[in-house]
Amino acid sequence: MEKHAEILAPAGGEAQLRAAVLCGADAVYLGLRGFNARAGAENFDENTLPQTVGWCHARGVRVYVTLNTLVTDRELPQWLHSLDAVAAAGVDGVLVQDLGLAKIIRQRYPTLPLHASTQMTIHNLAGARLLEEMGFAQVVLARELSKEEIAAICAGTSMRCEVFVHGALCMSVSGQCYLSSVLGERSGNRGRCAQPCRLDFKSHGRGYALSLKDLTLTDRLRELEALGVASFKIEG
């Protein structure tokens, strides 16, 4: 574990990237214009990604790129093109959900650090150890875990464990919800969740019955660090 857990901030575009870096983030995560779980964001151009990475590295900030949607065989050639661009840019890690894509990355770029996306729903030590065997370097733990479960996973794996400390909570289990797909044909696992859970569904007279309160653990950072958490993730 590092002396201090990193603060990992989202960068949906250039303005957000600069704000995160100038406000003290240790690392940022960002997506290209395709194959990431925030399709609605501005995102980044693969042609200018090397300059973006260089700007961050010059300020001591790590850059992780999200390629964390499920990908079909038809889309694989374009995904490989994006992967090549990401690797050439010198990023510090790539987040994936699809295990098949993880295998391709490990074969094609064996030294490129692999990060397991929250969409993998890693919720126990067995799952974390499986990823470790596959060569993953960092894992985003499921939001639904207790502090005891987080501590057990952190203690039982050599991977760096990443935990969300601020952002939304899913009414389902993170990465497993189909509500947006069913109601609006917008898949959360393809980066297009419409968050229909935020609508005013009623149950027994209670409004917004599916809309959870947002997550905030900003008053628990020291406690999380003591559990072995290596990265505090802010949702983007």
Residue ranges and their predicted role:
Residues 2-122, 140-144, 149-231:
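Active-site pocket-lining/capping segments in soluble small-molecule metabolic enzymes
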Residues 125-126:
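Conserved nucleotide-cofactor-binding alpha/beta core module
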